[in-house]
Amino acid sequence: MKKVKKKKSDSRRRRNSISPQTSSDSSQQPSSETPPSCPEPASPPSKPQPCQESTTPHQVNPEPKPQQHTPQPLPPPEKPASSPFLVPMEPKPILPSRKAAVPLTYVAPRSCSCAACPGSSACWHRLGLCHSRIFDVLLPRDWSSMPGRGVPNLLTFYRKPSRKYCAPRNSRASSSRNCCCGSGGLGSCLLHG
């Protein structure tokens, strides 16, 4: 029985001697982990602070970077919306610009006397557009100033009429073009320059 007690006590001593080593190993492990992040653990007050400062900006920097990326996509859409030259290039703003142009064309028929044309329905009067404005809707206003582009044949859009019931075109446009209607049948209206 004495021998058994000694064996137990020896095993306890071994366990106690092993457990402090494991605890010392565990205490050594964090210290071994610390040097890779902080190269010199000899002066802990000064070195860990720079390491913490270096890790803190890295943690803070990723947050502002997405915030910086978020505003950057927003200004480019605002710039095309404010500049008239870039709006037609984007498909979405084209629709509002055409919608905005439609009320202008609705105002124009009042100044143009399409009522004198006997075939006013053929002059797109049903759409609320004067036949002089149809040409502007189908082609851009800068068509004549574009290099390499000739004036399209008006017979593509209108039939050749006899010239009667002429009234001056919208005051906004050049006075060289007139809104004229002929006495012919349907489709006898012509925009001539």
Swiss-Prot record:
Any one Pfam family match given in the protein's UniProt record, by short name: SPATA3
Chain intervals with Basic residues compositional bias: 1-16
Cellular component GO terms held in the UniProt record: sperm flagellum
InterPro entries the record matches: SPATA3 (IPR026717)
Region (Disordered): 1-92
UniProt tissue specificity: Strongly expressed in testis. Faintly expressed in epididymis, ovary, spleen, kidney, lung, heart, brain, epididymis, liver and skeletal muscle.
Regions of compositional bias (Pro residues) in chain numbering: 36-48
Biased composition (Low complexity): 17-35
Subcellular location: Cell projection, Cilium, Flagellum
Entry superkingdom: Eukaryota
Keywords on record: Cell projection, Cilium, Flagellum
Name listed for the protein in its UniProt record: Spermatogenesis-associated protein 3
